[in-house]
Structures are given as C-alpha cells and as structure tokens.
Regions:
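Mobile cap/lid helix-loop segments that gate and shape the active-site cleft of serine hydrolases
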Residues: 31, 75, 81-121, 148
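Short beta-strand/loop motif that positions the catalytic acidic residue
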Residues: 119, 125-127, 131
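Conserved alpha/beta-hydrolase "acid-adjacent" motif
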Residues: 132-141
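Short beta-strand immediately N-terminal to the catalytic nucleophile in serine-hydrolase-like folds
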Residues: 52-54, 79, 126
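Acidic beta-to-alpha connecting loop that harbors the catalytic carboxylate
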Residues: 129-132, 160-162
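Cap/lid segment of the alpha/beta-hydrolase catalytic domain
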Residues: 1-56, 60, 83-94
C-alpha cells in the first residue's frame, strides 16, 4: 500500500501547492500514475495488479487516474467522487478553478464525465444518497456517462447515508464490499 501526496498538497511550498490552479485534478492524477508506474517497476511489485482507491477528492482522483492511464491500474474504487466541478461547492472549487465562465476549458478538461470513455480497468463506485458534500448527482451523471460509453462497472449505493457513509452496519458493509471487489479483480 502506498499513499502518494501529489502536486497540490501542502507542506512543500507555494509553487508545489499552486501548480494545480485552474486545472485541478490533472497534475494530481499524473502524479498517481507516475507513482504506480514507479512502484510497478520494483521487482517485488506485480505491475499487472495495481489498484487505486479514494474517497471524495481521492475518489475523483481515482476516476481521473483510471481515465488518463492505459493499463496502469487493474482496478479502482471511487467513493463519493466529484465527477464535475460544476456540481461541487463553489467556495472550494472557485478558489482553485475560478468560475466556469472564467475557466470553461479547465472545467471541461478536469471532469471525469468527459473522460468516461477512456476509463481503463475495473471500477467500483460507491455513494450515499444523502451526501450533502459531494451530491449524489455526481455518481448518477457519471454512471450514465459510463453506460453511454459502454463501460462496465460496479456500483454500491447507500440509502440515506451522507458523505461519511456510516451508521449501524454501513461502514463494515462498505469495507467488506471494497475488500471483496479487490479480491476478485486483483489476481
């Protein structure tokens, strides 16, 4: 298991964190892909069995990474992913992307919706229907884009669960689902 802090993360200076301005998601995905390729080059890593997963922005990065690489990730799990920055909180998004009117090309280039046909690998997408952070619409729009691109995928929906997807047996069910998916697809 590797955790990669790509460009845009804090703690490495202004240039590093601001490099994603108006193109949030592109460089971060490139960094995940580069890290996976590097890890796959190590003798003790099976490069044909690399997966990627993330929650929220990490789910978004999973979708972007799987759509911007060919053959790098055998499978991926995207939990509560943003699929179009137009659907997300403007206070957060516009700090990095400006408004859609000011940066329309940036919004198009950074949308997994526009890259659904390029998705490579097995995908499990998970969302809660009561998510008030990354609205469920993101998952619905993305699943429709995958269907229109004739891409097969798996989806797990949690009724009345918010962005954290927890309560009663939910979190156990979620991680069991992720584990089972990875067990089936990483062989």
């Amino acid at each position: 298991v590797a955790c990669v802090d790509g460009r845009g993360t804090g703690g490495r200076g202004t240039a590093f964190s601001r490099s994603i301005y108006c193109k949030m998601g592109i460089l971060e995905a490139q960094d995940q892909i580069a890290a996976a390729r590097y890890l796959g080059s190590l003798g003790y890593v099976d490069s044909s069995n690399i997966a990627i997963w993330g929650w929220s922005f990490g789910g978004y990065t999973t979708l972007m990474s799987m759509s911007m690489s060919s053959g790098v990730f055998k499978s991926g799990v995207a939990i509560a992913p943003v699929t179009d920055w137009r659907y997300y909180d403007t206070v957060y998004t516009e700090r990095y992307m400006r408004t859609p009117q000011e940066n329309n090309d940036g919004y198009i280039q950074t949308s997994p919706l526009k890259k659904a046909a390029d998705l490579d690998g097995k995908l499990l997408i998970i969302s809660g229907t009561a998510d008030d952070n990354v609205h469920y619409l993101n998952t619905l729009q993305y699943s429709e884009a995958l269907v229109q691109a004739n891409k097969q995928f798996e989806m797990q929906i949690y009724t009345n669960r918010n962005h954290s997807i927890y309560g009663c047996n939910t979190r156990y069910h979620l991680y069991t689902r992720v584990y089972d998916f990875l067990q089936r697809n990483l062989k």
